[in-house]
Amino acid sequence: MDEKTPSVTNPVENEDLALLTQASRNAINRLVRCLFAERLLAPNALLWAREGRQAWFPLWPSQRMLHFTDLSLAPAGTLRNRGQIEVLDGTGARQRIDDPAALMREVASSLAITPASDGLEHLLRDVDNSMRNDMLARRERGRWSARLRQEIAEAGAPGFLAYLERSLPTHLAAMTLDQWGALEGHPFYPTWKAKPGLAAEEVAALSPEFGARVPLRIAALRSSWAYVEKMPHVGSYSEWFAENFPDLSRDWAEGLKARGQSPEDWLPLPVHAWHLEHFVRREFAAEIEAGIFDPDGPEIVTLPSMSFRTMLPTTEAPRPFIKLPVAIWMTSEQRTLQAKSIHMGPRLSTLISDIVSEEDDLRCRLEILTEELGAILRHPETGDEHLGRFLSVVYRKADALARRDGLLPVTVAALLTAGPVDGRPLICELIGKSGDESEAAIAAFFRLYARTVVRPTLAMYLLYGIAFEAHQQNSTILFDDRGLPRKLLIRDFGDGRSFAPLFTERGYELQPFSRGGILPTTFDDDISLVRSFLINACFVCHLHEIALCLTEQYSVAGDSLWRVLREETEEAFETLRPRMLSDAFWLEERQAFLERPWPARSVLRMHLERYRDYRIEHQLPNPLASAE
């Protein structure tokens, strides 16, 4: 680690100590939420004080007791720790728990599962790395916020969002907000910032929450060694690339000619700069030597989006996003770009585009960032694409971010991120435009927000069997000049799930991707895997988090916002009922969304079990069932 970067375990300055304390609390709070939500610790074993928010949890194997000084229960069984945690032994002695490692070791013997032999230590290493990176990010966020406050004041803008709208093209304003919203990561991932293997200066140089600018190399891949997937309107790969990146295409072709090569024999293949120097040159040395892959070429500067490896060129005129593999472990997964994403991104983009073009109501409520083109290294004789997960690309059109209708695109995670002016979540700046922050106004705003998300999402699922992964990173809301939500903009279809009988019944087709060792995403027999994907992403990770935020920020009474969400979900079901395949199907799905427990991904358990199963889920109390 860089000597200038303080160690998490040995902070040397007051600022570092404050940042460490904040990072440690962040980690502990995420772990507490996951431990109880995933039933690794039984929430019904908590002993609550008659008044206030104190609670105790018995650790029977060790004959000890956890004491929470400020623990609150929100809808969906969400336990939020806002105070100190102590452990009491049999003598009554107390010891405060100040770091996540101490918490996990204290509860390890009481977990409802048996972790893998190295599961706990791997988890703690990733949590520690998350804390290090969280400290770096929040230190830089303080500096970035100070700069922005000065710029906003000098511009006389009423807020951060207004300042961005005035000072940048809409697509770059949207990307600034996307990077701004990358600070917190997934709302409850316990390894929310883990990037093991990256030095501190690399984390800062490559990560969106630092406002990074990252170069991409436009390398070359032998066309005979490439598989290309494209939407029907796209011509050849090279023609599309030349049309969308004319200067790069020209420089790339001239470079090949200067090296004695014919550009017609090659495809331009963007490669992330870090990935090229730290992985590709070493792991693909044989392909480079054999003339299959040429690592030389021109470069383009890009803005990494919230996903870290989907990049938007910094050009004044919008260019397509470039999604790439990066051989870095982040939030406990290596960020490859598998063949499934190359094949299914353009295919699902085509299917969804065809559906939306025929559905007037959907067209008014929904836009998508289409994945027009993808390519991957593929062995010309065996057809093997496995190695290509490290040499691949998907291009995603960015035109929907370049607005001319006055709407501002804001990635959902940015709405929940503290703004630079007053430190409140940015969603509060949008609500504040009305000048009315009464409870009735908050409920009205959330009703419109929920309708904006729920109507198109449920229509696409219930009528066509297509589930958007509409969590905070993939969902963008288009807001009007009054700060009101108007449309949903969805991205990332490579892993989208679908239920074939529904869209085929309505005359549509989708070629599924099937490959050994890769989880399928198109299903024929069981819609529950598609439904759980949608509920977890859209309802648990997105709408529930918005309701939690607004309830806390505006002291909204009880579960009234979940009651609003229930009403909007009920209304969506009633509207769609005449078009659904059967009343039995309508009733089954209505009960799944409104009455039965919600499925959610067990991210902490997966980590502890070393990812032996990527589809482990747990059940959350359905907050809509109790909000009648």
Curated annotation (Swiss-Prot):
The keyword Membrane does not apply. InterPro entries: Aerobactin_biosyn_IucA/IucC_N, IucA/IucC-like_C, LucA/IucC-like. Disulfide bonds: none annotated. GO terms for biological process: siderophore biosynthetic process. Transmembrane segments: none annotated. Gene3D superfamilies: 1.10.510.40. GO terms for molecular function: acid-amino acid ligase activity. Keywords: Plasmid. Belongs to the IucA/IucC family. PANTHER family: L-2,3-DIAMINOPROPANOATE--CITRATE LIGASE (PTHR34384:SF5). This is Uncharacterized protein y4xN. It comes from Sinorhizobium fredii (strain NBRC 101917 / NGR234).
